[in-house]
Amino acid sequence: EFYIMALPSDKDAMRLAIYENKEISGGDNEAAAKKADQKTQLLLKILGDMQQNDKISASTNLTEVLHKAAKGSGLPMRKVGQAPFFVLRGAGMPAVLIEMGYLTDPAEARKLSSQSYLYSICSSFASGIVTYVKEHPVVAD
């Protein structure tokens, strides 16, 4: 098996790391084990923050490409923002939430019920996704 310094890939990997770290940090010495565990928890937090920053960066790049594609097609895209939406958490890839209008606004509801308008939106986003994938090729595991 191969391991790299990163967040644990599964529970077994975490258990193994805790066991091995315990052996290196003083075996059954409870104080040493507790200190090592605190260091491990801090490291996991730092690695999690780094992975989150990478995900935010990739999501920002995708958002910029999609925003540009939508604006280029004449769609009214207001702004690019950031917020901790639940539906965006835990995605292992760039993730974007796109608000296309409000059904409570009669004018926007009419647009959103138009097949040609929806086709235009979908075409713009599909074009943006293709552009993003070409600019950021996926590396297989």
Language-model segment annotations:
Residues 1-141:
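Active-site-proximal helix/loop segments of hydrolytic enzymes
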